[in-house]
A protein has these predicted regions:
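Charged, alpha-helix-forming regions
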Residues: 1-255
């Protein structure tokens, strides 16, 4: 059984954006998906390794089965069957309805994907009004110069893509109409109400990280938060500690 990872989630969200806002042919290449995921311009080329990672994710999601309880959506839309209100419903489909195709562009033949249907998770999120939309400039993180101005781009490693995607999802949840109560993004896993909540270390796949890996993840997260504060995406953030141990970041997402 193949798992749906944090990286897959970022790829999936990029595909959904391209389906809804992109070319009406609904044909996407790994390069298009990677650019949408990271905020790169059309003139910037992802590496072969980055493209291969996206292609693996897309191929995997084509064969992952998705079951979604759509009861509330059906009730909200007052959908009936034989004049009777439907009280319970479940969608059973593929996570990504797509077929692999080969297309020729610029004299080169490349692997692409024809997205056959609105990605199911996006469709459901739209139905319950939980679609998250962020600008390309929010995705395109810049390191800040000593004077606070934007400097060079923070390179997109797989770890940084995971950190960025998770932070954005949490921040958008804080900004949403329900305003999530917990403004703290934890670095370590923790238990609440009998459930395990994963911290940034686990989100990046580092269940037992080394000291160097922890330092790098913390620094990357803080660079992103500092950039978003400078550009107005968030209002502020604070480093959370227990003694000398850094445990997370408290984010103020709105004034």
């Amino acid at each position: 059984r193949q798992s749906f990872t944090e990286y897959d989630r970022n790829v999936y969200n990029a595909v959904a954006s391209l389906y809804v806002y992109g070319d009406p042919s609904h044909i996407v290449t790994p390069a298009m998906v990677y650019r949408a995921m990271t905020g790169l311009t059309d003139a910037e080329k992802p590496t072969a390794g980055q493209l291969a990672a996206v292609a693996r994710s897309l191929d995997k999601m084509r064969f992952i089965r998705a079951r979604i309880d759509c009861t509330e959506e059906l009730k909200m839309r007052h959908i009936t069957l034989n004049s009777q209100q439907i009280n319970n419903g479940e969608i059973d489909t593929s996570l990504l309805m797509a077929e692999a195709v080969k297309v020729k562009a610029g004299g080169q033949t490349v692997k692409a994907y024809h997205i056959l249907k609105v990605p199911i998770l996006y469709e459901y999120a739209a139905a319950v009004k939980q679609v998250l939309t962020v600008s390309a400039s929010t995705l395109d993180i810049k390191e800040l110069n000593p004077d606070g101005s934007a400097g060079a781009r923070l390179p997109n490693t797989e770890s940084r893509i995971l950190i960025k995607g998770y932070l954005i999802r949490r921040i958008e949840g804080m900004k949403g109409k329900n305003k999530l109560n917990n403004p703290v993004v934890a670095l370590y896993d923790y238990q609440r109400d009998g459930e395990t909540h994963y911290g940034l270390y686990s989100i990046t796949g580092k269940v037992d990280p080394t000291r160097e890996e922890m330092r790098r993840i913390r620094e990357d997260a803080e660079k992103m938060l500092a950039y978003w504060k400078a550009t107005g995406y968030i209002t502020d953030y604070e480093v959370q500690t227990q003694g000398k141990k850094i445990t997370g970041f408290k984010i103020t997402a709105y004034a």
